[in-house]
Amino acid sequence: FWIGRTKGVPVYEKLSYPLLLLSFFSLTQDWNQAYININYVGEFSNGFVPFLNSTFLTSLLCVALVGFINLLHYSKKYDRPWPAQKDLFHLISYGISGIFLVVLYGTFATEISNYWDQLLISTPVYNADLKIFKAIWLLNYSLLFMTALSFLNIIRLKNNTLAILSITLNILVLFAFLTVGLYGLSELRESYLGEGQLVPNEPGFYNISIRYISFLFVAMLLFVSYKYIKQAYVSVAA
């Protein structure tokens, strides 16, 4: 892609797009394989090291490469290979931007998921609370991710299409928290107050305190969503 765009060789850039798709699907396969290795193969039976494993490092490399492609693609310094085909340009723009966001989100979501999965299977006595913690922290991460994306668009990008997309996703994430999240938090509270605290792996105060962490993330997303609808460039009809 870099050669095609910066050196003005359109055929190279066109060839890079199927390679980008292939790399994306290969990465999703790596994520799936990491899940299998933890839950069925027991690859990390001696302990999973968050953010210091081959899957995470590979994902970071993909984030950097796809991010670099996006920077070149949106740079006005270089001409695109099909200047007259605006619809095709927009389609490609949505595609590579979407891939970047999915890879960026999935890189850390996979790490969070794998951490809690490994913790669950490594405990000598089954602890159902760990599955709930996994769901809650994936929701917390989603809330934080959407807050950061929305804030970046408000102060820097100011893109209407991204604004409509992120507002929609903000609503979906908040709905997920109000349904799955609140139910999970209530289950953790019941586990802390109930008979479960009399058995090994007894619930601790973290079962209660995590709700305040989640509420903070919810408040942040609500605030940035409110700021969104006040932006002049945000329009459904645009």
Task: Describe these PLM feature segments.
Residues F1-A238:
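Alpha-helical transmembrane segments of multi-pass membrane proteins
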